[in-house]
Swiss-Prot record:
It comes from Photorhabdus laumondii subsp. laumondii (strain DSM 15139 / CIP 105565 / TT01). GO terms for cellular component: ribonucleoprotein complex; ribosome. Keywords: Ribonucleoprotein, Ribosomal protein, RNA-binding, rRNA-binding. InterPro entries: Ribosomal_uS8 (IPR000630), Ribosomal_uS8_CS (IPR047863), Ribosomal_uS8_sf (IPR035987). It comes from the Bacteria. This is Small ribosomal subunit protein uS8. Transmembrane segments: none annotated. Gene3D superfamilies: 3.30.1370.30, 3.30.1490.10. NCBIfam families: PRK00136.1 (NF001109). The gene is rpsH.
Length: 130
């Protein structure tokens, strides 16, 4: 059985891993998941990520905690396979009045809402992280 929404699965694994105080979570790897992991690491929401395995690559995310509490307070999928959400550069949302980030898939790659605004790009809103 194939997975319907791999990005939602990735976000759920992160949410569940932090709820269970796991050190790391693993999942099947893809280019889009690696790009999202890169953005999460750059923004300080995860400690690190690495890809393991040759035939079936696995993506391992090392989760981040501060004083025993998960750094990611909320992480939610926005655009999904049944309802895609696209926004122009002027319509990009601010998550929690700028305290969180929106992960946006643009023509220049996956980036935060701030980076997309600076580059003058719109795109598909993949998820919100706060």
């Amino acid at each position: 059985m194939s997975m319907q929404d791999p990005i939602a699965d990735m976000l759920t694994r992160i949410r569940n891993g932090q709820a269970a105080n796991k050190v790391a979570v693993t999942m099947p790897s893809s280019k889009l998941k690696v790009a999202i992991a890169k953005v999460l690491k750059e923004e300080g929401y995860i400690e690190d990520y690495k890809i393991e395995g040759d035939t079936k690559p696995e993506l391992e995310l090392v989760l981040k905690y501060f004083q025993g509490k998960a750094v990611v307070e909320s992480i939610q999928r926005v655009s999904r396979p049944s309802l895609r959400i696209y926004k122009k550069k002027d319509e990009l949302p601010q998550v929690m009045a700028g305290l969180g980030i929106a992960v946006v898939s643009t023509s220049k790659g996956v980036m935060t809402d701030r980076a997309a605004r600076q580059a003058g790009l719109g795109g598909e809103i993949l998820c919100y992280v706060a």
